[in-house]
Every structure is written in C-alpha cells, then in structure tokens.
Amino acid sequence: MNNSNRIRLTWISYLSYALTGALVIVTGIVMGNIAEYFNLPIASMSNTFTFLNAGILISIFLNAWLMEIIPLKRQLVFGFILMLIAIAGLMVGHNLMIFSISMFIFGVVSGITMSIGTFLVTHMYEGRQRGSRLLFTDSFFSMAGMIFPIAAAMLLARHIEWYWVYACIGLLYVGIFVLTLCSEFPVLGHKATDQSKPVVKEKWGVGVLFLAIAALCYILGQLGFIQWVPEYATKTFNMNISQAGQLVSNFWISYMIGMWIFSFILRFFDLQRIVTVLAAMATLAMYLFVSTDNPAYLSYYILALGFVSSAIYTTLITLGSLQTKVSSPKLVNFILTCGTVGTMLTFVVTGPIVANNGVHAALATANGLYLAVFILCLALGFFTKHRSHGHVTH
C-alpha cells in the first residue's frame, strides 16, 4: 500500500468518527426544535432518537460479517446514497414515521462507516502505533461533538429549519465519499487469502471476553456518570444550569486534550499496563467527585477524570485487535458492539436507580462500573496475547 493511499484511508477513518460524533451529540441541541416541529412533548420526542442508536448497534454488529462479503468501497458508496435518502426524508417528510426511519438510516450509515474506519486503522498500523493512531482517530468524535452543536445553535438562532443541521453533518460524508472514490481498500474474506497457504482461524482467547465486558462497563459508566452530572450539581450543590453545564464542558474539553496527548504517549508503554493504571486513576477521580462535599473541587475532579479516562476505551479496542496475529474485523466489531450496548443501556440502568435512590446513587453505580473496568484490566494481564504476538514495539 503506497503512502498517499494510506493517508486517504486514514482520513476516511477520521471522518467516520466525526460523523458518528456529530450525529449522536447534536441530538440534545435540536431535540426541542424537532419536538416543536412535530408538536410533541420533548420526552416523547427523545424516544424516537433510540432509532439512531439502534441503527448504529445493528450495523456495527452485522458489519463484522458483511465486511468479508461486501467490499468496503462498495459499502461506503452505498452509505452515501443512504445518507442522501435520509436527509431528503427529513426535508420532505413531515411525519414521525419518516423521521424515525431517517434516524435509523443515519444510525446504519454511521455504524457501517465507523466500523470500517476502526478496521482500517487496526489493519494499516501495528503494535503501539495502532493504539496511538486509533486514539487520535477517536478524538475526531469529540471534536465533531464540540463543533457541530455550536454550528447547530448558530443555525437555529437564525431561525433556519433544524433539518439543515443534518444536511451540514452530511457534508462529512461527502468528504468520505470523495476520498473513497480515490482510494484502494484492503480486500477481506476468501478473496484476500493466499491460496498457497492454508487458512488458519485464530482463537480469540478469554482476554477478548475481558476486554468486551470492560468496554461495556466503561461506556455505561462514563455515560451514566456524565448524563446525570448536571442534575447532581443543581440538586445537591444548588448550582445554576450554566454552572452545571460548564462541568460537562470541562469534562469533554479535558477528554479531547487527553486524547491528543495520549496519542503520542501510548506508543512508549505496554498497553495492558497503561490502561490498568488509567482505569485506577479514573476510578479514583470519579470517587473524589462523587464523595466531595465542596462544590469548589468539582471542576478539578472532573477535569482530572476527563483527562485520565480519555485513552481507556480506545486502548481496550486496540488491545482487542492485538489478541490475534492478524487483525480481525469480527473481533474489533465485537468489542465495538459491546461498547454500543453500554450506550443503549445508559438510561435503562440509571433511570430506575435515580427514581428509587436518587442521582447520587447513579453516580456511585458509575463509579462501581469504573472499578470493574480496573479489575478486568488488571486480570487481563494474566490472559492477554498481545505480548506473545510481538505487538509491544512500534
């Protein structure tokens, strides 16, 4: 693979994560306007966005097998057509069913592109460089999550219809589409096998199970924590909504900075050891946030939490990809799917806890999930195969 083609494929990976970040995080900005557009209460409207998450989950799960059947280039070109259909549906369709279908299509396209983007990085880069590249790729999720809500707010403030926000997000896929047409993609499945060599299926090992459960616990813990921080800050410490929102902003800004810094640092450390240390530090930072009685300390603790936890999820995925000698799209997508299940379970798990025991109990549960991630990462040290496969150098 020549260098210019590798760069194009890497940028497809970057934009795939930016697309998912924009679609998921912009929801909170446009939800009120969409509810008003359909003349529905905002609580009812929020349920329809489940179609977006469902589309992401289903497509990531299925694409573990589809990648070996349908060429990656064809999938991305087809995704562009689906993206146009979904945006057109939002613009010309004026009923809730078409909106829900469009959201599901967005989710499917997002899941397909993100799973392809993740595989491309794990396929093109080896060892610790894979971890740093994947982490930098993941930072585009957060970057889009910061840029597009601001852009959406500007459009809505100028009384431009909400569906133009999704048209703007669609521009990211235009970039993916153009790069796709100019690029050559790795061939997977039976076509990729060397006929002179027998195909040997590698066993994943128990380490993959540990990583998958850790990914689920991490995402469930992170979202279960950050979704309830504003409520906790306003109810427990009598902060106004602006101050509570600033805590959340501090978390994501610190998270993004952490991603950039760790993308350079990770290549110098053994991934299993560094993720164990980071999980321990994140658990401690969250414990300090949840247990403090002084609101002045909350910003410091959440900044620390965002920074040290920024590399955990991507490192879990990277370690998963290193459990086999040849990177497996099924393995990577399995861990991604488990993480996405954590997203889907956020309110299913934390909602009843808040209703019965209060917001503090939900945050304590999130802290317990982070502790579980630490224990799983520690135990992984006895089962991981990344060292025996020679994946500990650049």
Swiss-Prot record:
Domain of life: Bacteria
A cellular component annotation (GO) from this entry: plasma membrane
Main location: membrane
Secreted is among the record's keywords: no
Transmembrane segments: 11-31, 51-71, 76-96, 101-121, 134-154, 162-182, 206-226, 246-266, 274-294, 302-322, 334-354, 363-383
Subcellular location: Cell inner membrane
Keywords, sorted A to Z: Cell inner membrane, Cell membrane, Membrane, Transmembrane, Transmembrane helix
SUPFAM superfamilies, sorted: MFS general substrate transporter (SSF103473)
Cross-referenced Gene3D superfamilies: MFS general substrate transporter like domains (1.20.1250.20)
Membrane topology recorded in Swiss-Prot or TrEMBL: Multi-pass membrane protein
GO molecular function: transmembrane transporter activity
HAMAP family linked to this entry: MFS_TsgA (MF_01044)
NCBIfam families in the record: PRK03699.1 (NF002982)
PANTHER family, sorted: L-FUCOSE-PROTON SYMPORTER, PROTEIN TSGA
Record family assignment: Belongs to the major facilitator superfamily. TsgA family.
Name of the featured protein: Protein TsgA homolog
Natural source organism: Yersinia pseudotuberculosis serotype O:1b (strain IP 31758)
Classification lineage: Bacteria, Pseudomonadati, Pseudomonadota, Gammaproteobacteria, Enterobacterales
